[in-house]
C-alpha cells in the first residue's frame, strides 16, 4: 500500500487543524511536500513570533519543527497514532529573520520510538538557521 496516497498534504493539514493546541495553530505552519520519511514545511514570518532584533524567536522555531516532525511521523506510519515528544535538542546557527523552510527526516521508525532530524533554513537565503535532533514515543 502506498502510504502517501492514504496520508498526503490534505490529511496532514487536517491533522494540524484537529489535534494541535490552539497556540500551535497560530504558528500557521504550511505543508510544502510529503514523501517517504521526509517532509517540507514553511514557517512564514509572523510578527507574533518575532522578538527584539526583528528575528523569529527560538521557541517558535523549535515548536514549528516539533510540529512538523509529528506530521512527518504520522505520515510515515500511514495513519493517525498517538505519539509524544521524548527528547528534542536544537542548535541555533544563525538568526531567522524572514521565515523558515523546515525539512524533516525520519532516521528510524521503530515499533516504540522514532528518531528524526530537522533542519531549518532561512526562506530567503537558504542558509541553515537551526539543526534539531528529536525522538518520539509511539503510544
Regions found by a protein language model. Name each.
Residues 1-139:
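Terminal targeting signals and extreme-terminal segments of soluble enzymes
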Amino acid at each position: 500500500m502506498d502510504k502517501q496516497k492514504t496520508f498526503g498534504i490534505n490529511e496532514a493539514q487536517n491533522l494540524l487543524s484537529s489535534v494541535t493546541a490552539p497556540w500551535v495553530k497560530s504558528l500557521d505552519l504550511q505543508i510544502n511536500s510529503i514523501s517517504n520519511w521526509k517532509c517540507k514545511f514553511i514557517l512564514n514570518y509572523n510578527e507574533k513570533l518575532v522578538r527584539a532584533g526583528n528575528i523569529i524567536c527560538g521557541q517558535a522555531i523549535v515548536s514549528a519543527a516539533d510540529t512538523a516532525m509529528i506530521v512527518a511521523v504520522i505520515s510515515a506510519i500511514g495513519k493517525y497514532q498517538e505519539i509524544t515528544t521524548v527528547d528534542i535538542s536544537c542548535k541555533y546557527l544563525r538568526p531567522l529573520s524572514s521565515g523558515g523552510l523546515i525539512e524533516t527526516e525520519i532516521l528510524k521508525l521503530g515499533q516504540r520510538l522514532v528518531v528524526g532530524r530537522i533542519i531549518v533554513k532561512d526562506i530567503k537565503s537558504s542558509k541553515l538557521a537551526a539543526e534539531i535532533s528529536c525522538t518520539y514515543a509511539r503510544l
